[in-house]
């Protein structure tokens, strides 16, 4: 690990010992590789786990490549018993989050653990001690590495594969975390529906709103990518500002996320709503590339040959479901049905493009306005994710 990387990864001065369990900080690239690959041990026989791309995980956790690290400190910990890795956790101080919310919160995330409460307790003790050492008063998570990325622990809905950029974990994680003294902070919902036409009444209301509104709905123009990203960014920061857990993305973070997602975007499913040229809402629906990534076991190449890449290209043609991953409306335009218009238009386009159905995720459990809209569109709630909290003291 480079000197710059070491400076970005804070750690306690000595290993934490808990009986036969030793928790140590990740301080070099080799340990970071072990940290990432430990997931394969946990999910070895799990039918629903989708292995992440190893290349992407290394880039995500590399402070020199991920702009999140410009305003955050991240400590990665590995738990070992008799030299064998049995757990991992990340502790995060996001200075932008704490500044925005005037709080002293540490995230925890990237949690993986064998089914042993002593191992889990040792990992959370390491995270708590790290956070206390930085003057932080509470833990919140799982966040991988913030609410702008993967969020929450799956607590309901273990019988199907996760969609792209949604979390997945063994059912026993919730019990482990609660036995370590954490409690519920917030639940998040995921919803599913087929690509069948929207309910007649819902569609009729949305069509009437659209016909009598000066709002125009259009597809994102990827040939004018940077300008479109600027418009979406404006809506994103305004629409989500009051949401629980929200933290504004920096310019560099948003631009990187946009570049990363561009390869997955189908222009017909990336919608902007505008009024007299002003962007007021947007929705983003992407094909569920997890259906293809599941076939790769985390690798695009094998022995230098692009075997994984060829598999990805082949199975990408067979993707038959989508994920509506973002839908936001500026505050001054809410309760005018713009969200319903975007949902109906998305459903129709998904059907026209030949997909079989998809997921809407995630929504806050207490966001009644958007949850009612999603339910009225014919969606059924299929998964529940939980964010936990605890004091560091």
Where are these regions (language model features)?
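TRNA-binding/sensing appendages of the translation machinery
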Residues: 3-5, 15-59, 128
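Catalytic cores of nucleotide-enabled group-transfer and carboxylate-activating enzymes in metabolic
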Residues: 25, 29-32, 45, 51-63, ...
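Flexible loop/turn segments at secondary-structure boundaries
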Residues: 32, 95-98, 147-149, 198, ...
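A conserved beta-strand-loop-helix scaffold within acyl/acetyltransferase catalytic domains
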Residues: 39-82, 89-99, 219, 224-328
């Amino acid at each position: 690990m480079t000197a710059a990387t070491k400076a970005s990864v804070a750690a306690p001065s000595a290993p934490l010992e808990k009986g036969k369990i030793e928790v140590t900080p990740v301080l070099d690239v080799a340990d970071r590789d072990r940290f990432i690959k430990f997931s394969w041990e946990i999910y070895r026989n799990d039918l629903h786990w989708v292995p992440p791309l190893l290349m992407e995980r290394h880039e995500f956790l590399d402070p020199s490549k991920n702009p999140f690290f410009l305003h955050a400190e991240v400590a990665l910990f590995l738990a070992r018993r008799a030299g064998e890795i049995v757990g991992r956790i990340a502790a995060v101080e996001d200075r932008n989050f704490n500044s925005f919310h005037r709080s002293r919160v540490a995230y925890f995330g990237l949690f993986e653990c064998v089914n042993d409460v002593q191992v889990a307790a040792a990992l959370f003790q390491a995270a708590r001690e790290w956070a206390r050492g930085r003057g932080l008063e509470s833990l919140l998570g799982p966040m991988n590495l913030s609410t702008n990325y993967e969020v929450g622990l799956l607590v309901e809905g273990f019988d199907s594969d996760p969609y792209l950029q949604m979390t997945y974990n063994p059912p026993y994680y919730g019990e482990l975390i609660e036995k370590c003294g954490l409690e519920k902070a917030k639940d998040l919902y995921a919803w599913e529906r087929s690509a069948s036409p929207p309910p007649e009444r819902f569609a009729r209301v949305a069509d009437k709103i659209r016909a009598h509104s000066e709002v125009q709905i259009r597809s994102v123009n990827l040939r004018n990518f940077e300008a479109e990203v600027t418009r979406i960014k404006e809506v994103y920061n305004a629409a989500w500002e009051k949401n629980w857990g929200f933290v504004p993305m920096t310019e560099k973070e948003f631009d990187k996320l946009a570049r990363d997602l561009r390869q997955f975007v189908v222009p017909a499913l990336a919608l902007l709503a505008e009024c007299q040229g002003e962007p007021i809402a947007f929705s983003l629906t992407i094909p569920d590339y997890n259906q293809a990534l599941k076939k790769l076991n985390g690798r695009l190449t094998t022995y230098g040959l692009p075997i994984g890449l060829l598999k990805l290209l082949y199975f990408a043609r067979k993707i038959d479901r989508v994920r509506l991953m973002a839908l936001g409306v500026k505050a001054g335009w809410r309760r005018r049905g713009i969200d319903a218009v975007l949902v109906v238009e998305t459903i129709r386009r998904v059907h026209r493009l030949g997909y079989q159905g998809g997921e809407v995720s995630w929504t806050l459990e207490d966001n009644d306005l958007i949850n009612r809209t999603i339910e009225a569109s014919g969606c059924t709630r299929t998964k529940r994710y939980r964010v936990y909290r605890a004091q560091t003291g």
